[in-house]
Amino acid sequence: MGLDFAVDQLYSTGWSALDTRGCGRLDDGRAYPEPGRVEGEFASMGFGLTIKHIQLFDCYRAEWRDSDGSAAGSVVGHTIDEAAVYALSQMRRATAAVAV
């Protein structure tokens, strides 16, 4: 997938980097939220986020749960930033679909 793809997916949800605190930058200059900020964005939406390194596959798994502790979604990425950003894009898509 790659971090570029994850950032593309996040921007396609309407996410904006107006506040760049807690953000990294891609080579093309686009800002993206780093894992600590992503955790905060999940918390503000009522979800808990955990990101774990899966040594066997050398990847990261991001999983989020609702306030009841029920699994709400998960993604994998090659890096922790990729997994965090892609998880945020998927959570934003899911919550936008529910709101419609």
Predicted features and spans:
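Short intrinsically disordered terminal tails
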Residues: 1-3, 89-100
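N-terminal segment of the canonical double-stranded RNA-binding domain
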Residues: 2-70
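N-terminal cationic amphipathic segment used for targeting or macromolecule association
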Residues: 4, 60, 81-85, 97
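Conserved aromatic
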Residues: 32, 74-78
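Residue-level detection of beta-strand scaffold positions
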Residues: 61-62, 73-75, 87
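A short, charged, amphipathic alpha-helix used as a generic interaction element across diverse proteins
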Residues: 78-92
